[in-house]
């Protein structure tokens, strides 16, 4: 051993630290989880944690530590200086820090604290090995793993026999040590012989201690020691020498806090149970994720040989660790429970900045993606899977409303922020819902949040919390629920809005409702006065026209009404074309941004008008007078005005109250007509009821109303009354247009309207002249929706394709006359109503920008479905070409029919591209040659659910498909997926499947293919299974891949094994290493697997059931491969494809990273 060199002190110009030892070696000896904050940054000092370090070092219980009432539980300090030291006797590392409490801090200090978190102080190239008994013996040497020697040590000259060299390394005190490095033995291995025994005896190393070799930035070989955690009598005198220092640390902190003076502390990372000097940025980040009972989290622990591992746990309590001396302290205020039974020496209480919150409450294998759930019929058992039932039993606070994920959310992959917050407040099972207001704060200013958080309060429940909007789940929460067979319409998802917009809108709604009730009383009085004035005018008109007989007026009125019926029947197709032309000119309402007050006023009008206008046709039919034909048009408007003053009722009671209001108002109007001396004729009532039903079935136009008024005018009515009636009819036309447009946003109004339409339909079938069938009414309601933009024009009519108004509607997909390039987000989504039971998904999203006209609500001919609704692309958060994941339950009966139809269907043509049978299909954009080409999708005759009522597709480019897809044989799901995922060098996760649980998911990543436009249509296989696209049975992987270097990979079914012993025995037999895998302690082979968190774990640590559920792939590693993983220091450094549980369609989890021919295995 050579004499130690002099230790110089050199300041660090970047961090302001004064170092006398190598920083990389210090951090390597301190541990992989230690990273000291830089000098000049802000830190949070916890005296309670400092007391724990003193108690652990002096082996003195915390009960004997005195209390300091003037010392708060935390101090915001400026870190002036950091000095890295090591004990000269034991080589234990520690740091000396100079802190000064501060009350105010500037932005530069905050930035310095934030930048300190991003600095990686651990060495890049190092090797750590735990010493064995042979390594510490006096007659032996130190065995170095092959990959560690090749990576850290200089290269050997293998031309020598035996190959050997001399190594020179420096320890943490800058002492130089010389060793002989030789490559010998059988089998041959790297050994350190000469000089090693001297090093072991001088440093007093024992079995269990660790030795580190690192190569710093100057290519110098450094040597460090990390001793095992043993009970030591006391620390060295350089850290703490007496009990007075034990008590003095708190007194020094209290004095510094009172005078804002600097004080010095010593931090021993190997002895301290947890770091008590926390960077301010780390502390603030932890405060943003406020915890609640039942929250899942991960925590990183150090393992052997400088490795780390994440353990999962659950927060079981929030309370003070020491409520007497440290009240409202955030130090170890979380009581936790670990998932694994063998917790070992893991603590039972942690601090919030020590954990990583799992941002989904169900972070359990499989990954947190639930497919849409549908509540079953009353009294019928739900066919939920075992995995989902187990999740509900384990976490009862989950309900069926937590379903679809937000694909664009990066901080909350399972749920959106508002969904999770509403779940916490709505469900009473969460005990901390009232105490903990939220899981994440609102978008607050960082500086203001820090000042409010750290300046005055110590209550963790008041730190950076935010309030969620009142009510239930927000409009951004897409809920897909089964509906009973009595309810023909499903609740449509509302367009997503931001949190601030929801709060503003709800506040305006509450204030406007009170104002609306006050105005309704005054409006009702004015309407009654207008009614009396109109009755007086009618009486005067009756006296002036007494020269005409009553019988002649009745005959003339009947003739006019019959002529009106014939004209309306002939003009019905022309009205449809007129409506479609008007639909083209309507601007896109969703692209406009009205003020919040205008929004809420428009909402109130849409809420009131539909309820007030539902039964105008029936009331008008009961209250017509034969003498004055003008009252036929006047009374519905009066009824509408009187009903407008009613208060909005909930959906459950609005129907009954509407009937009661109808009966009361009809009695009042009948009494008013008795004063006029009018008599009602039964024949006129029948005819007028027909005309009123026409008003409900077809949207009226102003010309239509003017024609009716002219035909039904009494001979003696003057011009002023005619103008008044025309104005009334115009207002009524506008009210009905608003009424039909509001159907999209008021699902309970849709329910009432459909019941009313069914009643009218029955009455029309009894009469000799029935007007329109139900499906045509729905198509007319669909035509009232606003278009996307003025450039997106729908075809004006479907009559050119042979569609009659009374034939079953077909699905027409056409291209516009001119190619439009709408902005991003200008696509069309189509949602279909739920009409029948089953387990098919209730929606079909399509990010296609093809302009398609949906002429009916559905094309499955099992039953009539609700109207298909087109909503703008802004209603659902989609980005670029990313196809939203669809998760659907598989119907075995439908699957058998799909298989049977697949055998009988013909092969693909040039215009037909089959992509998937049960997942997602892609329609490629049409080219210039077929923009004006229309094709008609046939009606499917599947005995399945009729919810998937949209065929989302477009014409296929005649030039692109045969050359690059069909001619090359891309006619299977796997080939198409590989083509899409590998095109342009973009790698995506495709086709995730699993066999060990009943949940089956699929994820398709679609890159930005230049030859394909953004017109990608996503359809459910329930629609595409029996038409132009032949069905194909989906491959499902039920085996787990096992690999071993030098051998051909095998596949096994882990479900058929009963435990680890059978698994090890069978794997050893498969790969010809019988007897070498059964005992993991003495075996040279290590059996590892990749779990659902993409971590490489040792087989046998977890319970067998958890292993079966979470294994993705298995690897048999040799001892040299395990040492290389330890050398890299990152057990989770091998990227793994996105798979769920046991294997997947997308290939081997080790492919491209660790295979027999890969030169970069484990970052080698």
Swiss-Prot record:
> Domain note for this entry?
The PB1 domain provides both positive and negative electrostatic interfaces for directional protein interaction.
Coiled-coil regions, chain positions: none
User: This chain belongs to which protein, by name?
Assistant: Auxin response factor 7
Q: Where is the PB1 domain?
A: 1037-1130
Q: Which InterPro entries match?
A: ARF_dom (IPR010525), ARF_plant (IPR044835), AUX/IAA_dom (IPR033389), B3_DNA-bd (IPR003340), DNA-bd_pseudobarrel_sf (IPR015300), PB1-like (IPR053793)
In residue numbers, the region (Disordered) covers 451-505, 536-555, 570-728, 765-858, 903-930, 1145-1164
Q: Which Pfam families does the entry mention?
A: ARF_AD, AUX_IAA, B3
Q: Subcellular localization, per the record?
A: Nucleus
> What domain of life does the UniProt record list for this protein's source?
Eukaryota
* Composition bias type Polar residues, residue spans: 464-489, 637-651, 678-710, 791-808, 903-921
**Which keywords are on file for this protein?**
Activator, Auxin signaling pathway, Developmental protein, DNA-binding, Nucleus, Transcription, Transcription regulation
Question: What family does this belong to?
Answer: Belongs to the ARF family.
* UniProt keyword annotation of DNA-binding present: yes
Q: Name one GO molecular function term.
A: DNA binding
The record's tissue-specificity note reads: Expressed in the whole plant.
Low complexity bias: where? 570-635, 652-671, 711-728, 765-790, 841-851
The biological processes this protein is annotated with in GO are: auxin-activated signaling pathway; blue light signaling pathway; callus formation; gravitropism; lateral root development; lateral root formation; leaf development; phototropism
The record ties this protein, via PROSITE patterns, to: B3, PB1
DNA-binding region extent: 127-229
Q: What does this protein do?
A: Auxin response factors (ARFs) are transcriptional factors that bind specifically to the DNA sequence 5'-TGTCTC-3' found in the auxin-responsive promoter elements (AuxREs). Acts as a transcriptional activator of several tropic stimulus-induced (TSI) genes, including SAUR50. Formation of heterodimers with Aux/IAA proteins may alter their ability to modulate early auxin response genes expression. Required for differential growth responses of aerial tissues. Involved in ethylene responses. Regulates lateral root formation through direct regulation of LBD16 and/or LBD29.
User: Could you describe the subunit structure of this protein?
Assistant: Homodimers and heterodimers. Interacts with the auxin-responsive proteins IAA1 and IAA12 (BODENLOS). Interacts (via PB1 domain) with IAA17 (via PB1 domain). Interacts with IAA19. Interacts with ARF5. Binds to JMJ30. Binds to ATXR2 in the nucleus.
């Amino acid at each position: 051993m050579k004499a130690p060199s002099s230790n110089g002190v050199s300041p660090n110009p970047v961090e302001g630290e004064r170092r006398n030892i190598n920083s990389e070696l210090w951090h390597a000896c301190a541990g992989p989880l230690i990273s000291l904050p830089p000098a000049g940054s802000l830190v949070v000092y916890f005296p309670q944690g400092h007391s724990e370090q003193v108690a652990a070092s002096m082996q003195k219980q915390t009960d004997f530590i005195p209390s300091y009432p003037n010392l708060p539980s935390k101090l915001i300090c400026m870190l002036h200086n950091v000095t890295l030291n090591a004990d000269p006797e034991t080589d234990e590392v520690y740091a000396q820090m100079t802190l000064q409490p501060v009350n105010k801090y500037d932005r530069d200090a905050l930035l310095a604290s934030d930048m300190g978190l991003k600095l990686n102080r651990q060495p890049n190239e190092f090797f750590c090995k735990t010493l064995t008994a042979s390594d510490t013996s006096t007659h032996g040497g130190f065995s170095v793993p092959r990959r560690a020697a090749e990576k850290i040590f200089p290269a050997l000259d293998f031309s020598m026999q035996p190959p050997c060299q001399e190594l020179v390394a420096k320890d943490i005190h800058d002492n130089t040590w010389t060793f002989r490095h030789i490559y010998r033995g059988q089998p041959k291995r790297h050994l350190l012989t000469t000089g090693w025994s001297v090093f072991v005896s001088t440093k007093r190393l024992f079995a269990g201690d660790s030795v580190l070799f690192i190569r710093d930035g100057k290519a110098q070989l450094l040597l460090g020691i990390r001793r095992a955690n043993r009970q030591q009598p006391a620390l060295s005198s350089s850290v703490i020498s007496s009990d007075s220092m034990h008590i003095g640390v708190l007194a020094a902190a209290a004095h510094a806090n009172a005078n804002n003076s600097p004080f010095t502390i010593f931090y021993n990372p190997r002895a301290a149970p947890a770091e008590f000097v926390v960077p301010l940025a780390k502390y603030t980040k932890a405060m943003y994720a406020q915890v609640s009972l039942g929250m899942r989290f991960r925590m990183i622990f150090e393992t052997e040989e400088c490795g780390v591992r994440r353990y999962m746990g659950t927060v079981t309590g929030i309370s003070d660790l020491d409520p007497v001396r440290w009240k409202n302290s955030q130090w170890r205020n979380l009581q936790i429970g670990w998932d694994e039974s063998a917790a070992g020496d893991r603590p039972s209480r942690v601090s919030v900045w020590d954990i990583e919150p799992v941002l989904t409450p169900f972070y359990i294998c499989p990954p947190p993606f639930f497919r849409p759930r549908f509540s079953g019929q009353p009294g019928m058992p739900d066919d939920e899977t075992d995995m989902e039932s187990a999740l509900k039993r384990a976490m009862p606070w989950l309900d069926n409303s937590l379903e679809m994920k937000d694909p664009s959310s990066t901080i909350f992959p399972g749920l959106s922020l508002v969904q999770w917050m509403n779940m916490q407040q709505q469900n009473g099972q969460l005990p901390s819902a009232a105490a903990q207001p939220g899981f994440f704060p609102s978008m607050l200013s960082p500086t203001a949040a820090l000042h409010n958080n750290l300046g005055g309060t110590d209550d963790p429940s008041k730190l950076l919390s935010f309030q969620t909007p009142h009510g239930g789940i927000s409009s951004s929460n897409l809920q897909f629920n089964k509906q009973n067979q009595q309810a023909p319409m499903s609740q449509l998802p509302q367009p997503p809005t931001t949190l601030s917009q929801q709060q503003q809108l709800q506040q305006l709604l509450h204030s406007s409702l009170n104002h609306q009730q006050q105005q309704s009383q005054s409006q009702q009085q004015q309407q009654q006065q207008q009614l009396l004035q109109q009755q007086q005018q009618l009486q005067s008109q009756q006296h002036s026209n007494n020269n005409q007989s009553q019988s002649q007026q009745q005959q003339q009125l009947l003739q006019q009404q019959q002529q009106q019926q014939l004209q309306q029947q002939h003009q019905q197709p022309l009205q449809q074309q007129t409506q479609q032309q008007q639909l083209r000119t309507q601007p896109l309402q969703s692209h406009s941004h009205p003020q919040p007050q205008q929004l809420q006023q428009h909402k109130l009008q849409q809420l009131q008008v539909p309820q007030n206008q539902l039964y105008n046709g029936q009331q008008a039919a009961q209250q017509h007078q034969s003498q004055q034909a003008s009252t036929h048009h006047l009374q519905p408007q009066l009824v509408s005005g009187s009903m407008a003053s009613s208060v909005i009722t909930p959906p459950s009671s609005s129907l009954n109250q509407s009937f009661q209001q109808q009966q009361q108002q009809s009695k009042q109007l009948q009494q008013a007509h008795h004063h006029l001396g009018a008599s009602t004729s039964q024949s006129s009532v029948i005819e007028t009821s027909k005309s009123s039903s026409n008003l409900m079935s077809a949207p009226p136009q102003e010309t239509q109303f003017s024609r009716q008024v002219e035909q039904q005018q009494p001979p003696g009515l003057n011009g002023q009354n005619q103008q008044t009636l025309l104005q009334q009819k115009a207002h009524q036309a506008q009210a009905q247009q608003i009424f039909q447009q509001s159907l999209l946003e008021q699902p309970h109004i849709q329910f009432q309207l459909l019941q009313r339409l069914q009643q009218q339909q029955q009455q029309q079938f009894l009469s000799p002249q029935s007007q329109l069938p139900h499906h045509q009414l729905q198509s007319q309601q669909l035509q009232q929706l606003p278009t996307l933009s003025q450039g997106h024009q729908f075809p004006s009519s479907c009559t050119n394709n042979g569609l009659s108004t009374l034939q079953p509607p077909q699905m027409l997909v056409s291209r516009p006359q001119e190619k439009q390039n709408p902005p991003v987000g200008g696509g069309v989504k189509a949602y279909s109503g739920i009409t029948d039971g089953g387990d098919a998904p209730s929606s079909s999203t399509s990010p296609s920008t093809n302009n398609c006209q949906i002429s009916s609500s559905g094309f499955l001919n099992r039953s009539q479905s609700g109207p298909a609704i087109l909503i703008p692309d802004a209603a659902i958060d989609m980005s670029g070409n990313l196809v939203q994941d669809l998760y659907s339950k598989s119907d075995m009966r439908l699957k058998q029919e799909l298989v049977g139809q697949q055998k009988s269907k013909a092969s693909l043509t040039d215009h037909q591209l089959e992509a998937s049978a049960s997942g997602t299909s892609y329609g490629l954009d049409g080219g210039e040659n077929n923009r004006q080409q229309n094709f008609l999708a046939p009606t499917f005759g599947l005995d399945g659910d009729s919810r998937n009522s949209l065929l989302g597709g477009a014409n296929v480019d005649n030039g692109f498909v045969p050359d690059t897809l069909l001619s090359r044989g891309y006619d299977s799901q796997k080939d198409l997926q590989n083509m899409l995922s590998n095109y342009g060098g973009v790698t995506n996760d495709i086709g995730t499947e699993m066999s060990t649980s009943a949940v089956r998911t699929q994820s398709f990543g679609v890159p930005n293919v230049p030859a394909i436009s953004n017109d990608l249509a996503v359809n459910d296989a329930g629609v595409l299974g029996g038409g132009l696209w032949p069905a194909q049975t989906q491959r499902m992987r039920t085996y787990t891949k096992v690999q071993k270097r030098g051998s051909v990979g095998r596949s096994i079914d882990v479900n058929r094994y009963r435990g680890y012993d059978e698994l090890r025995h069978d794997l050893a037999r498969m790969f010809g290493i019988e007897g070498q895998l059964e005992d993991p302690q003495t075996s040279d082979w290590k059996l590892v697997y990749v779990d659902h968190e993409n971590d490489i774990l040792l087989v046998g640590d977890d319970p067998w059931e958890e292993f079966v559920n979470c294994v993705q792939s298995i690897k048999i590693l040799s001892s040299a491969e395990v040492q290389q993983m330890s050398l890299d220091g990152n057990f989770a450094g091998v990227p793994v494809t996105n798979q769920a549980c046991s294997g997947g369609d997308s290939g081997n989890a080790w492919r491209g990273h660790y295979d027999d021919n890969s030169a970069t295995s484990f970052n080698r």
